[in-house]
């Protein structure tokens, strides 16, 4: 019999402590438990909405918790399946004739590319996409989620809306109410109202117990009281069954030579990586007490998790914003919180299946509609308008094209429109990927920025600024810069914090709105 000696175990424990940010604390264990309780229904709902067996949603979150922390990256982000990927995953499943194996092959390929992006330190590529286009993409995902979950919320027979696109589904909402199952619709609408009410209630109780958990507990009670398992329709409740058989699924690469396969690889890679990088960036700006994240390491961790999930047919995982927000609120400080969130989910899946199968699908739909609303709330539209009318135009254009076609076309349309608008502002096509800087002849510690600063030049200028800083430059002067767009202003806000370089001259340029990060241009004065 082979046994591990203490001397053999010690190096492994030391490696885990280093990877996870020290020994596990009681705060991390507590946060892991509370996040797991919140992640359980979300993971079930995301899997079901994506067209996957619900158990695979939990399995994906388990992998996101147990295996990604080893690679490092972000100390406080929680990895798991996300509502923002429902649209792509369900579209892939539909495109490949419901073949989970082909989608698994797409995910496995995506994971390898994700890991390579992190290893090659290309995590900063997420900066090249215009802010308003990214927000438009997320808002369109929110609208698609809402459209596809309304009939589930109302208890409409899935056969009546299977395969429909979001715009027809929005137009069919009055008909869905006519076809609603009164009992299921009541549960769904009560769940939705409770989520909106409880999310706006302030108090100690709601910092400890997530509103989603209260809703699920209440609807489990309702489903038992109303005997939905025996008297409700077959689609009323979550079905788990023998989840261990799902792990036998293998990736099917037979479509790897097709354009469709690589289109979805690109979509999976783009949206999942971008959402993760946005989450990591957002929480780096918050004073959480956690160590600063390494976005490249986080991509590597995501790639490792997604590779494992591709091999077993799971859903893609990202650094998920809702769970991460909860983790910060619950006091999680290290990657152990993510690990314990995965461990507790594993315990739930093994021991609590009878209870999980009492959860109404309408309650899960309510959770997803609430998540979708947060992505596309009126506040998002108003905040975009405040930055500038041209930003709202980009935002709306991305949404419209996405709803009419798909996410890839929506983002491409938004970026093309952005470049067209920049052309009207005087930016020449030759300057779309060009930098123009020189040292100030009157001040050897200052770098003059002389060319347009737009989203497509962010990485190029970042390289120039880093080189200049290494040579002793202490400030960047934008007084002669002809144009700075909103995405570049957002980049400068973050870059100034990281580099501690002084920014000069931005207030001398004329902004397009009163927003501090509004696009601005040089107004030449007549002498």
Describe the role of every protein-language-model region.
Residues 1-32, 89-90, 94-290, 345, ...:
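Core transmembrane helix bundle of multi-pass membrane transport proteins
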Residues 16-21, 25-34, 38-75, 254-336:
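Membrane-embedded helical hairpins/re-entrant loop segments and their flanking transmembrane helices
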Residues 36, 66, 84, 115-116, ...:
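Hydrophobic/small/kink-forming positions within alpha-helical transmembrane segments
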Residues 42, 59-71, 82-95, 341:
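Hydrophobic alpha-helical segments within and immediately flanking transmembrane helices
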Residues 57-58, 76, 84, 103, ...:
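Alpha-helical transmembrane segments and their helix-entry boundary regions
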Residues 63, 81-82, 108-112, 190, ...:
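Hydrophobic residues within alpha-helical transmembrane segments
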Residues 70-80, 200-207, 329-335, 378-386:
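Membrane-helix interface "capping/anchor" motifs
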Residues 374-527:
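The feature marks cytosolic C-terminal regulatory regions of anion transporters and related permeases
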């Amino acid at each position: 019999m082979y046994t591990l000696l203490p001397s053999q175990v010690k190096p492994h424990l030391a490696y885990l402590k280093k990877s996870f940010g020290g020994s596990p604390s009681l705060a991390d264990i507590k946060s892991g438990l509370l996040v797991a309780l919140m992640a359980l229904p979300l993971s079930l709902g995301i899997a079901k909405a994506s067209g996957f067996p619900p158990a695979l949603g939990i399995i994906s979150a388990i992998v996101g918790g147990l295996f990604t922390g080893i690679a490092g990256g972000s100390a406080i982000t929680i990895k798991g399946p996300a509502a923002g990927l429902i649209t792509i995953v369900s579209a892939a499943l539909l495109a490949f004739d419901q073949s989970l194996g082909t989608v698994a092959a797409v995910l496995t390929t995506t994971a390898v590319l994700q890991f390579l992006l992190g290893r090659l330190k290309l995590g900063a590529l997420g900066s090249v996409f215009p802010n308003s286009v990214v927000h438009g993409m997320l808002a369109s995902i929110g609208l698609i989620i809402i459209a596809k979950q309304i009939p589930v919320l109302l208890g409409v027979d899935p056969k009546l809306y299977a395969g429909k696109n979001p715009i027809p589904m929005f137009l069919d909402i009055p008909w869905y109410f006519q076809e609603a199952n009164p009992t299921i619709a009541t549960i769904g609408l009560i769940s939705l109202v409770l989520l909106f009410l409880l999310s706006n209630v302030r108090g100690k109780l709601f910092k400890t117990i997530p509103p989603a958990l209260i809703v699920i507990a209440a609807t489990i009670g309702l489903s038992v009281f109303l005997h939905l398992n025996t008297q409700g329709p077959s689609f009323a409740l979550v079905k788990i069954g023998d989840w261990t058989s799902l792990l036998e699924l293998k990736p099917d690469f037979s479509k790897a030579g097709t354009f469709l396969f690589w289109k979805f690889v690109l979509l999976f890679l783009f949206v999942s990586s971008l959402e993760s990088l946005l989450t990591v960036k957002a929480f780096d700006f918050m004073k959480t007490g956690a160590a600063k994240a390494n976005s490249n390491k986080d991509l590597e961790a995501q790639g490792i998790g997604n590779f494992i999930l591709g091999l077993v047919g799971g859903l893609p995982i990202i650094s998920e914003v809702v769970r991460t927000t909860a983790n910060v609120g619950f006091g999680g400080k290290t990657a152990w919180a993510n690990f314990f969130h995965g461990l507790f989910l594993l315990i739930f899946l093994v021991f609590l299946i009878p209870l999980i199968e009492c959860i109404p699908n309408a309650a899960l739909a309510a959770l997803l509609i609430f998540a979708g609303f947060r992505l596309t709330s009126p506040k998002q539209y108003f905040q975009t308008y405040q930055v500038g009318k041209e930003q709202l135009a980009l935002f709306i254009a991305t949404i419209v094209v996405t709803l009419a076609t798909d996410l890839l076309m929506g983002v491409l349309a938004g970026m093309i429109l952005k470049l067209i608008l920049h052309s009207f502002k005087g930016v020449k096509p030759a300057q779309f990927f060009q930098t123009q800087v020189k040292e100030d002849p009157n001040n050897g510690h200052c770098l003059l920025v002389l060319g347009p600063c737009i989203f497509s030049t962010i990485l190029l200028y970042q390289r120039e600024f880093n080189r200049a800083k290494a040579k002793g430059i202490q400030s960047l002067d934008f007084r002669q810069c002809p144009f700075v767009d909103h995405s570049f202003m957002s980049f400068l806000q973050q870059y100034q914090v990281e580099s501690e370089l002084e920014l000069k001259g931005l207030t001398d340029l004329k902004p397009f709105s009163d927003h501090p990060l509004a696009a601005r241009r040089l107004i030449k004065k007549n002498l």
